[in-house]
Amino acid sequence: MKNIIALSSVPLVMTLGNSMLIPVLPMMEKKLSVTSFQVSLIITVYSVVAIICIPIAGYLSDRFGRKKILLPCLLIAGLGGAVAAFASTYMKNPYAMILAGRVLQGIGSAGAAPIVMPFIGDLFKGDDEKVSAGLGDIETANTSGKVLSPILGALLASWYWFVPFWFIPFFCLISFLLVLFLVAKPEEDEDAPAVSEFIKSVKKIFKQDGRWLYTVFIIGCVIMFLLFGVLFYLSDTLENKYAIDGVAKGGLLAIPLLFLSTSSFIAGKKIGKDKGRMKFCVVTGMILLTLSFIALWWNHSFYFLFVFLSFGGIGIGMALPALDALITEGIESEQCGTISSFYNSMRFIGVALGPPVFAALMSNANWIIFILSAFCSIVSLFLVLFTVDAKKSEEEKNLGTV
């Protein structure tokens, strides 16, 4: 249990370190005297750097061990937060140094949160029930961070606008100490394969399992694209249409995320080792997400907005731990970190694309947003139905192959 608590702190801290800045961006724009595009780069550079570095960190964790990569990366993420905090507090023109700090934070986060998923698979190797339950806890921590971040960010910024930056190194240090002292080192093979052999094995995985792996990657990207796009839309709508801002806006943003977090926790506990349940959770989740966007196209008034987005949150919460489990249960641990890193990179691409795409669509008509979102959801649904074979996993497990 202590392993799970410590590892759950990593995605929680990484999510807080990024998402809690979102409600503070309008204030930063004024304080830094920059354009809206420039202030958006504070979020974008973090995601772009992480996208590039995640596969590298995944490979290194497969080669040298999860904990050996995770701990230094937590320190790098904390250092990045400290650079941004120091610059915003003491420098006259801190914008460039804030971006530099965010680059460092992105590098650190690339080797932190994405490594946790294969780490869980290593720690509970051979116990599929514990693996799926652990992944559910990890996704719950991740989504809990999203629930808390708009509220916490608004609260901290109400003191001084730069205070959220100071909490990033503080959170990272706590997570570092938890992982250092509470997480056991998983058993590792004595001899790591040569680089050429490792690359061959990864290519073999994509050749053999690429059909369902590509689907998992695409759906992970789509879900995060829709999630962060919708959060951007909801934040903008609450402030500009309903004149709700500050902590009140943060609390309202947290409502659909709370449903997401709860369903993620329950799904992670119920999935177990059954690939059929994993597929069922993804399919059901994408159906709920599709229906919620169709309903929003029909009516997106204030109350219906939260009702239907909460149903969509339940769908996303069901799908995420199942997607994680499909990878950790379907890929051997020697390559799991690398494969998981590709998956997490796709998720970060979704995070980076969501807000700007939704912002562009919002300049036209809201119904376009909901039609596009429903279309993306239904395409993902059909991909799962026709490319993920639930029966195949039992046969593979009996044969002892990937």
Swiss-Prot record:
- Membrane-crossing ranges are 4-24, 39-59, 69-89, 104-124, 162-182, 212-232, 247-267, 278-298, 302-322, 342-362, 368-388
Q: What induces it?
A: Induced by mta.
- Compartment(s) of residence: Cell membrane
Q: Is Transport tagged as a keyword?
A: yes
The GO terms this record gives for MF are:
transmembrane transporter activity
- This protein's major location comes to membrane
> Does the keyword field hold Manganese?
no
According to its record, how does it sit in the membrane? Multi-pass membrane protein
- Give the matching SUPFAM superfamilies: MFS general substrate transporter
Q: Which domain of life is it from?
A: Bacteria
Q: What does this protein do?
A: Involved in secretion of bacillibactin.
Tell me which PANTHER family the record gives.
CHLORAMPHENICOL EFFLUX PUMP RV0191, PURINE EFFLUX PUMP PBUE
Protein name, per record? Bacillibactin exporter
Please give the organism. Bacillus subtilis (strain 168)
